[in-house]
Amino acid sequence: MTLNLCVLTPNRSIWNSEVKEIILSTNSGQIGVLPNHAPTATAVDIGILRIRLNDQWLTLALMGGFARIGNNEITILVNDAERGSDIDPQEAQQTLEIAEANLRKAEGKRQKIEANLALRRARTRVEASNTISS
């Protein structure tokens, strides 16, 4: 049995096909979703979406949004997303280093919040690019 997974950003569809299982980063922690999962609606955190296709795991970097799960269908609406395989690890690492420097230099509450969000996005991209599918 499978799940139909659809991951959408405001500009494009990132994923739309059947999967065996997912592990989703939510605002209250990670949840695993298998076929016949209880209906759920949840906020999606900045983090990794792990997708299992048979014996292979793929990753997507998600930049926050919402997910609806029910009737073996998962719809995830996010601000932005990238497939881990599309992310250049060196570029992602450079972006992380810049984000860390910007957080150290941040002054004022707003700058610190924005720098912290940029750092979380950069860490997520690095993690997604470094994940090896098995």
Swiss-Prot record:
Q: Name one GO biological process term.
A: proton motive force-driven ATP synthesis
Asked if the record carries the keyword Nucleus, the reply is no
| TM regions (residue ranges) | none
Membrane topology per the entry is: Peripheral membrane protein
- A matching Pfam family: ATP-synt_DE
Question: What is the predominant subcellular site recorded for this chain?
Answer: plastid
- GO cellular component terms attached to this protein's record: chloroplast thylakoid membrane; proton-transporting ATP synthase complex
Q: Which UniProt keywords apply?
A: ATP synthesis, CF(1), Chloroplast, Hydrogen ion transport, Ion transport, Membrane, Plastid, Thylakoid, Transport
* GO molecular function annotation: ATP binding; proton-transporting ATP synthase activity, rotational mechanism
Subcellular localization is given as:
Plastid, Chloroplast thylakoid membrane
Q: Which InterPro entries does this UniProt record tie to the protein?
A: ATP_synth_F1_dsu/esu, ATP_synth_F1_dsu/esu_N, ATP_synth_F1_esu_C, ATPsynth_dsu/esu_N
Q: Hey, which family's this protein in? A: Belongs to the ATPase epsilon chain family.
Subunit info?
F-type ATPases have 2 components, CF(1) - the catalytic core - and CF(0) - the membrane proton channel. CF(1) has five subunits: alpha(3), beta(3), gamma(1), delta(1), epsilon(1). CF(0) has three main subunits: a, b and c.
Q: What does this protein do?
A: Produces ATP from ADP in the presence of a proton gradient across the membrane.
Protein name, as recorded: ATP synthase epsilon chain, chloroplastic
